[in-house]
Amino acid sequence: MSRIEATFRALEDQGRKALIPYVTAGFPFADITPALMHGMVEAGADIIELGVPFSDPMADGPVIQRAGEKALGLGIGMSQVFHQVREFRKRNGTTPVVLMGYANPVERYEQIHGQGAQQGAQGAQEAFVRDAAAAGVDGVLVVDYPPEECTAFAASLRARGMDLIFLLAPTSTAERMAQVAQVASGYVYYVSLKGVTGSGALDRSAVEQMLPRIRQHVRIPVGVGFGIRDAATAQAIGKVADAVIIGSRIIELIEDQEHAKVVPVTIDFLRGIRKALDA
């Protein structure tokens, strides 16, 4: 059983829902990520999604795009992300960490450190998987990897105790859901809005209608993200989903903070979300 699976099982036994905050690695300061991750756990986070900066993030809205651009400017790449996870693991060996990003940084890392050029785009990615596992990563979400081409990658991750997570959207067909169900593990991330991260207001009724359709195909937990900006919305989504995922709002709150305030501001916000989820 992976750490992510164990986390969801424990939460289910407690009658609680998972709080999954997202932050871009190396944002807003290159050295702050491990401390920020610890702050998230202190505030009640159950799983942490750590964004891998990329220069062409097609699914991200302007807020997370800015975060990625700043992190790239600070020299944050995949090797630095692994280092940040290792630093976090020195004090926390239990909270699952999921890397969320795009194919290009994964493949670039593989070409430098492994045999990626020979394996093909969605190969087993052995060097990436090896080093992710060694760093203490628990799951990977690659936005632009199609599930039908990820059998080897998923098997490689699972062999090292990691999960491969996929997105589903309001436009996802039954066929797509079935394809995702074949290879996904850990949880599925349901994108509650059409468009990019941080866009629009979440429609709870639409989410309520979609989740039973997803669960006809997917037997693992379903987390909902995109458009969750406050405790009331998080509480409403927590009543129907297995996890609440919050990213853009956290980035907005910390992007202009001075170094000393980044962690306290994040803790304060997430404590409010946690309290609402547990109410």
Curated annotation (Swiss-Prot):
PROSITE patterns, sorted: TRP_SYNTHASE_ALPHA
First-level EC class: lyase
Transcription regulation keyword on record: no
A GO MF term: tryptophan synthase activity
Listed pathway(s): Amino-acid biosynthesis; L-tryptophan biosynthesis; L-tryptophan from chorismate: step 5/5
Keyword Lyase found: yes
One Pfam family this sequence matches: Trp_syntA
InterPro entries: Aldolase_TIM, RibuloseP-bd_barrel, Trp_synthase_alpha_AS, Trp_synthase_suA
Active site positions: 49, 60
Catalyses which reaction(s): (1S,2R)-1-C-(indol-3-yl)glycerol 3-phosphate + L-serine = D-glyceraldehyde 3-phosphate + L-tryptophan + H2O
Keywords, ordered alphabetically: Amino-acid biosynthesis, Aromatic amino acid biosynthesis, Lyase, Tryptophan biosynthesis
Record EC number: 4.2.1.20
Protein family (similarity comment): Belongs to the TrpA family.
HAMAP family, per database record: Trp_synth_alpha
Free-text function comment from the UniProt entry: The alpha subunit is responsible for the aldol cleavage of indoleglycerol phosphate to indole and glyceraldehyde 3-phosphate.
Subunit record text: Tetramer of two alpha and two beta chains.
Official protein name in the record: Tryptophan synthase alpha chain
